[in-house]
Regions:
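Alpha-helical interface subdomain recognition
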Residues: 1-90, 102-107, 114, 118-119, ...
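Short glycine/proline-enriched turns and hinge-like loops at secondary-structure junctions
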Residues: 65, 134-136, 160-165, 178-181, ...
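Short Gly/Pro-enriched turn/cap motifs at secondary-structure boundaries
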Residues: 88, 115, 130-133, 157-160, ...
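Flexible, small-/acidic-enriched active-site or ligand-binding loops
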Residues: 137, 190-221
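A short core secondary-structure module
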Residues: 148, 152-196
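Long, acidic (Asp/Glu-rich), low-complexity accessory segments flanking structured domains
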Residues: 217-235
Length: 383
């Protein structure tokens, strides 16, 4: 099933990511979680392997692959560690993506080679304390003064915020224009006035740095406007298809790791004189888990193929993310149940998988937003 309709290149990329995750990531995931930080050396290795520039063409220093290969790679890295999968997916989709798709030639030359190699990690500063799913309700302001943009405001839930060297910041430039008054900016994180207030203490993916950011008279050149003035919301929304495919793949990877742990445990654990996998209730749970994983993968690969072909896939990406993220919570919960009391202990990895999976129903658009997107698309659905 896993190899169905995959090209040789896609299989090669998947297997490379799998070997790397099993050898270099999974053995250290627990330690990184306790430290609250993914090892810098590991991130550098990811850059060397091309995992951080998968959406960037070779002319800009990337290792551009199709979205099927990208999704497969994110799944494998996330199976090794959900936090590392988050770093990879978010950096590719909303760190590299906006610069590639909307940057000027000069902006691309300045940033894409470093982003693609992992020498610079990107972050996405859209969400605010009062503006989550209602992304257009921003209070951060950017004013053009003497040829420079001066930005003031606060951003919340910034993934890669502490590690990033480049922030994609969204701010209101024309308050009277509503949604059309939001613009996007490239802000180097060493700019005076760009302040990482704190790193959040989270339920899961703890090694992924999630930060609150304040912009206090943060001043950048006029040329750091990304795309056209007033097109910021369009820029943010245009990354949703690829971003949601990535998060769906992250959820799938975490869930698959939980399933594999539960399967191994069920084969070894003996109760009532036989391995618990031979008890029908446990066997049925594993069968359901396996089926749900395969169903999620098919949805993800379908959306990824549409994205690669340049076809609209907003609904398909939302379906993939919605199903995969909710499936992941169920599969991880079942993995804990199969482990019994041991599943509740930190000595076993399944409790971490459960905590890591939960975020996938929230970021890059909550489950409720995904259902809204899917339902909206049904208005034009031909029966």
């Amino acid at each position: 099933m896993h190899d169905i309709e995959l090209s040789e290149e896609q299989v090669m990329i998947r297997d490379m990511a799998r070997d790397f995750a099993r050898g270099e990531i999974a053995p250290h995931a627990q330690a990184w979680e306790k430290a609250g930080w993914i090892d810098d050396g590991l991130v550098a290795k990811m850059g060397e392997l091309g995992l951080l520039g998968m959406v960037v063409p070779e002319e800009w220093g990337g290792t551009y692959v199709d979205y099927v290969a990208y999704a497969l790679a994110v799944e494998e890295i996330s199976a090794g560690d959900g936090a590392t999968g988050a770093l990879m997916s978010i950096h590719n989709s909303v760190g590299c993506g906006p610069v590639l798709n909307y940057g000027t030639e000069e902006q691309k030359q300045t940033w894409l080679p470093d982003l693609a190699s992992g020498q610079a990690i990107g972050c996405f500063c859209l969400t605010e304390p009062q503006a989550g799913s209602e992304a257009h309700n921003l209070r951060t302001r950017a004013e053009l003064r003497d040829g420079q943009w001066v930005i003031n405001g606060a951003k919340q839930f910034v993934s890669n915020g502490k590690r990033a060297k480049l922030a994609i910041v969204f701010a209101v430039t024309d308050p009277d224009l509503g949604k059309r008054g939001i613009s996007a900016f490239l802000v180097p994180t060493d700019t005076a006035g760009f302040i990482v207030d704190r790193t959040e203490h989270k339920m899961g993916i703890r090694a992924s740095d999630t930060c609150a950011v304040t912009l206090n008279n943060c001043t950048i050149a006029e040329a750091n406007l990304l795309g056209e003035r007033g097109k910021g919301l369009s820029i943010a929304l245009s990354n949703l298809e690829g971003g949601r495919i990535g998060i769906a793949a992250q959820a799938l990877g975490i869930a698959r790791a939980a399933f594999e742990a539960a399967l191994a445990y069920a084969r070894d654990r003996v109760q009532f004189d036989k391995p618990i996998i031979e008890h029908q209730s446990i066997a049925n749970m594993l069968a359901d888990m396996h089926m749900q994983l395969n169903a999620a993968r098919l949805l993800i690969l379908h959306a990824a193929r549409l994205r690669t072909a340049g076809k609209p896939c907003l609904s398909q990406a939302s379906q993939a993310k919605l199903f995969a993220s909710e499936m992941a919570e169920k599969v991880c919960s079942s993995a804990i149940q199969i482990h019994g009391g041991y599943g509740y202990l930190e000595d076993y990895p399944v409790e971490k998988y459960y905590r890591d999976a939960r975020i996938t129903q929230i970021y890059e658009g909550s489950s409720e937003i995904q259902r809204m997107v899917i339902a909206r698309e049904l208005k034009n659905y031909l029966v």
